[in-house]
Amino acid sequence: MIKNYFKIAWRNLVRNKVSSIINISGLAIGLACVLLISMYVADELSYDRFFKDANRIYRVNIDGKMGNNQFVVGHTGPPVGAALQNNFPQVESYTRMYLPGDEIIHFENNGQKSSVTEKGLLAVDSNFLKFFNFPLVAGDASTCLNGINSVVLTQKAAKKYFGDASPIGKTLVFDEYKTPFTVTAVLKDIPKQSSLQFELLQNTASIPPVKRFAWSWVWLQMATYIKLTPDAAADPKLSILVILREIQIGMGRLKTGSL
């Protein structure tokens, strides 16, 4: 019986070659599109899921208006994180980051002095590694960024600067500051599925503009992340609505975007 079905199907395909080719091609293209879209969606949904408290972490955005122009930016003024934590019990903690831009770094390895232009530099608050729980291969996440002249490297960066030798305790000199920064920890290389990509971390306290504008609500250069308490995270929409209803700053209203 089944053999006859296949024979009939084959005869129909041969008899109607053009329509058969169109139908089979359409089916193949459709299946390929579904597969590609599924792979894309799965990849997008995998970003930042490895963070322990991913469901409680939100990035603070500014929804504002200048003249007739409406804008939304993913950066805030330096005081925003502390203000949220101090005024809203739903906010357990916060951390901030600042992108300094490319930096010429001088270093010495095996007696040979070299310089490189570093593009993967990120300035962060001292609690950054505890907030996001990036895994370390050397050093202490609780203290490695406490020093104003501390620097943390990824494994890739450590190898670039110091080869196979341990980088802990060694120094990098940032051309802008002319000051040695001591390597205090080494991170595992950042996963591709992380929206936060960097190779070196330094303390925001070492950045002159951050200190200069620490009071400013309209110096929108800091990426601010907040972590809701477990109770608030159980109903994050309600908790965030309470915060949004009560706070409005400078040029616009705070908004949040989840990881």
What are these language model-derived features?
Residues 9, 28, 40, 80, ...:
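Structural preference for long, well-ordered alpha-helical segments in enzyme cores
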Residues 1-15, 19, 51-52, 215, ...:
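Membrane-helix entry/capping segments
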Residues 76-79, 88, 97-103, 109-147, ...:
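The feature marks short, hydrophobic/small-residue-biased sequence motifs that occur predominantly
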Residues 37-104, 217-231, 235-240, 256:
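Membrane-proximal extracellular/periplasmic loop immediately following the first transmembrane helix
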Residues 4-8, 39, 75-80, 153-156, ...:
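Short, conserved clusters of charged catalytic residues that mark active-site
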Residues 124-138, 149-259:
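Mid-to-C-terminal secondary-structure elements
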Residues 16-45:
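Short, strongly hydrophobic transmembrane alpha-helices
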